[in-house]
């Protein structure tokens, strides 16, 4: 009987101890990593609003280890394109999402 009581008490305190430890573990809200916003400069070579693409010959972009080249960027709903035209020198920001370069902001530069 004494042995059974010892086993029962040990089991009870073990369960209480584990519950106390579990309650001390705080689950922090994990925020999703925000994509890196990359800044660049270049010259607009073409705009296709129907397919939501803009072609820019950009300077080297160190943040993504890209050399100077001409490439297409996807125009997003937040991109204000009203003052941009082919031939403009521009400063722009984009995020890389897989194979897509999503244009976030673009402005005519001097």
UniProtKB/Swiss-Prot annotation:
Source taxon at top rank: Bacteria
Keywords: Copper, Metal-binding, Periplasm, Signal
Endpoints of the signal sequence: 1-21
GO aspect biological process, one term: response to toxic substance
A Pfam family it matches: CusF_Ec
One GO MF term attached to the UniProt entry: copper chaperone activity
Induction of expression: Transcriptionally regulated by CusR in response to copper and silver ions.
Compartments, record wording: Periplasm
Chief place where the protein resides: periplasm
Coiled-coil region list: none
GO cellular component terms given for this protein: outer membrane-bounded periplasmic space; periplasmic space
Free-text function comment from the UniProt entry: Part of a cation efflux system that mediates resistance to copper and silver. Binds one copper per polypeptide.
Subunit and partners: The cus efflux system is composed of CusA, CusB, CusC and CusF. Interacts with copper-exporting P-type ATPase CopA; when this protein is precharged with copper it binds very little CopA.
Further comment: The cus system plays an important role in copper tolerance under anaerobic growth and, under extreme copper stress, in aerobic growth.
Descriptive protein name: Cation efflux system protein CusF
